[in-house]
């Protein structure tokens, strides 16, 4: 969960998000080293009065500033490609959920069950219970079992939306007429908040996402209760 004056990412709640945090630190260190080197060169050039008017070209320097950036790009690309493959890998999901974006709410359908589907609207500020988060709470949460592979299919009914939960490292575009998919594993129980991350109209800021991860037996009890109420 984000908090005021937060400078870093939210706490990771999935293996993919943990990998993304490590990759961020890896890339940030490379950027820091490059920035330090460039700053040192600029200061050295400005602070000295010595100049060399006779070096018009240097084969060695040209080799260095061609090979070195290539090596740096490879060091960034390899871990990035690894994470991309991890995000695309879907092996035997325990639960498949279809999320459809509407103006301006989300609807969820648990495709492994015959009639388990519901709409999820933002709770208005005046209806919040003590401890609720303004503009983030919903009347129905997307409940998933923890430590289980979850496949989510994302689409939209009207305009472009985007289903995003930062703690899980997920951001998937919801496109009308197109079905995108991704997978995730929630590594610990908890409630994780997200929002539509694609400007989709006047009430774009008022279609939050709430994912609640619970133990498997709690999920089975919840799904049974939802089916009885359907």
UniProtKB/Swiss-Prot annotation:
Transferase found in the keyword field: no
Q: What is its main location?
A: mitochondrion
Q: Please indicate the ranges of residues that lie on the Mitochondrial intermembrane side.
A: 1-14, 88-230
Q: How does it sit in the membrane?
A: Multi-pass membrane protein
Protein residues bound to Cu cation A1: 161, 196, 200, 207
Any one Gene Ontology molecular-function term assigned to this protein's record: copper ion binding
InterPro entries, per the entry: CcO_II, CcO_II-like_C, CcO_II_C, Copper_CuA, Cupredoxin, Cyt_c_oxidase_su2, Cyt_c_oxidase_su2_TM_dom, Cyt_c_oxidase_su2_TM_sf
Location relative to the cell: Mitochondrion inner membrane
Annotated Cu cation A2 binding lies at 196, 198, 200, 204
Residues annotated as binding Mg(2+) are: 198
Q: Which Pfam families match?
A: COX2, COX2_TM
Catalytic activity as recorded in UniProt: 4 Fe(II)-[cytochrome c] + O2 + 8 H(+)(in) = 4 Fe(III)-[cytochrome c] + 2 H2O + 4 H(+)(out)
Give the co-factor note: Binds a dinuclear copper A center per subunit.
Question: Which EC numbers does the record give?
Answer: 7.1.1.9
A GO biological process of this protein is: ATP synthesis coupled electron transport
Please provide the record's keywords in A-Z order. Answer: Copper, Electron transport, Magnesium, Membrane, Metal-binding, Mitochondrion, Mitochondrion inner membrane, Respiratory chain, Translocase, Transmembrane, Transmembrane helix, Transport
Query: GO cellular component terms?
Result: mitochondrial inner membrane; respiratory chain complex IV
Write out the topological domains of type Mitochondrial matrix: 46-59
Cofactor(s) annotated in UniProt: Cu cation
Keyword Lyase, does the record have it? no
According to its UniProt record, this protein's enzyme class is translocase
Similarity remark: Belongs to the cytochrome c oxidase subunit 2 family.
How does the annotation summarize its subunit structure? Component of the cytochrome c oxidase (complex IV, CIV), a multisubunit enzyme composed of 14 subunits. The complex is composed of a catalytic core of 3 subunits MT-CO1, MT-CO2 and MT-CO3, encoded in the mitochondrial DNA, and 11 supernumerary subunits COX4I, COX5A, COX5B, COX6A, COX6B, COX6C, COX7A, COX7B, COX7C, COX8 and NDUFA4, which are encoded in the nuclear genome.
Q: What does this protein do?
A: Component of the cytochrome c oxidase, the last enzyme in the mitochondrial electron transport chain which drives oxidative phosphorylation. The respiratory chain contains 3 multisubunit complexes succinate dehydrogenase (complex II, CII), ubiquinol-cytochrome c oxidoreductase (cytochrome b-c1 complex, complex III, CIII) and cytochrome c oxidase (complex IV, CIV), that cooperate to transfer electrons derived from NADH and succinate to molecular oxygen, creating an electrochemical gradient over the inner membrane that drives transmembrane transport and the ATP synthase.
Q: Which NCBIfam families match?
A: CoxB
The protein in question is named Cytochrome c oxidase subunit 2
Species source reads Danio rerio
